[in-house]
């Protein structure tokens, strides 16, 4: 049975992990946030979050966006390929409803799950 936990092993933890994702990465974006992905050699996907204070001013807004991103990843993790993903928030993300954010995440997860052309 699949577990839907979001354990430590499913997170990007060190600056080196993030730097690896930014090199030779595939991008999928919307006007509200971008997801950057790179293949990993693990048996599961991992998630990292970048929600700058410059983009989303309030801690409440940043925490809300991160909570929704983690929840979307947690629910989709079994359909995702073995890649490292970094979600980068943009200023307009704070204006979306929770439902709109989830729909956008689903669309971008699907786009990044397709086999790459190169």
Swiss-Prot record:
One of its GO terms (biological process) is tRNA 5'-leader removal. Gene3D superfamilies: 3.30.230.10. Its EC number is 3.1.26.5. Keywords: Endonuclease, Hydrolase, Nuclease, RNA-binding, tRNA processing. InterPro entries: Ribosomal_Su5_D2-typ_SF, Ribsml_uS5_D2-typ_fold_subgr, RNase_P, RNase_P_CS. It catalyses: Endonucleolytic cleavage of RNA, removing 5'-extranucleotides from tRNA precursor. GO terms for molecular function: 3'-tRNA processing endoribonuclease activity; ribonuclease P activity; tRNA binding. GO terms for cellular component: ribonuclease P complex. Belongs to the RnpA family. RNaseP catalyzes the removal of the 5'-leader sequence from pre-tRNA to produce the mature 5'-terminus. It can also cleave other RNA substrates such as 4.5S RNA. The protein component plays an auxiliary but essential role in vivo by binding to the 5'-leader sequence and broadening the substrate specificity of the ribozyme. Consists of a catalytic RNA component (M1 or rnpB) and a protein subunit. This is Ribonuclease P protein component. It comes from Vibrio parahaemolyticus serotype O3:K6 (strain RIMD 2210633).
């Amino acid at each position: 049975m699949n577990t839907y936990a979001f354990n430590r092993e499913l997170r990007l933890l060190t600056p080196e992990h993030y730097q690896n994702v930014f090199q030779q990465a595939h991008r999928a974006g919307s006007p509200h946030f971008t997801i950057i992905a790179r293949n990993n050699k693990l048996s599961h996907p991992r998630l990292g979050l970048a929600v700058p204070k410059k983009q989303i001013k309030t801690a409440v807004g940043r925490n809300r966006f991160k909570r929704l991103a983690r929840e979307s990843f947690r629910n989709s993790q079994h359909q995702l390929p073995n890649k490292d993903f970094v979600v980068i928030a943009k200023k307009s993300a704070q204006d979306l409803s929770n439902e709109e954010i989830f729909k956008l995440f689903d669309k971008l997860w699907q786009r990044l799950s397709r086999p790459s052309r190169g």
